[in-house]
């Protein structure tokens, strides 16, 4: 034991509404250096601050969240092709 911290990934399946990001989100996020890709809407009780979403075999990094008044959380993500996504 070297006292090294080894991070282990825990996966959880949840139902989500999946859409492309709006043009205005694409433009504003692009100005901040993000490359917006997809928006996922999940129930607030199912989201615990995770920074990575996997959908259809592709990993997306969460760059922004929004708690909607209907009890859901909107997860705005970017596709980091060829990059390591940090959890």
What are these regions (language model features)?
Residues 4-87:
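Short, conserved turn/kink motifs that form compact alpha/beta structural patches or helix kinks used as
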């Amino acid at each position: 034991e070297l006292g090294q911290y080894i991070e282990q990934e825990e996966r959880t399946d949840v139902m989500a509404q999946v859409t492309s990001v709006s043009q205005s989100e694409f433009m504003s996020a692009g100005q901040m250096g993000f490359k917006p890709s997809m928006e996922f809407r999940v129930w607030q009780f199912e989201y615990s601050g995770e920074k990575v979403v996997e959908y259809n075999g592709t990993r997306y990094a969460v760059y922004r969240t929004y708690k909607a008044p209907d009890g859901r959380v909107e997860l705005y993500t970017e596709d980091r092709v060829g990059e390591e996504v940090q959890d």
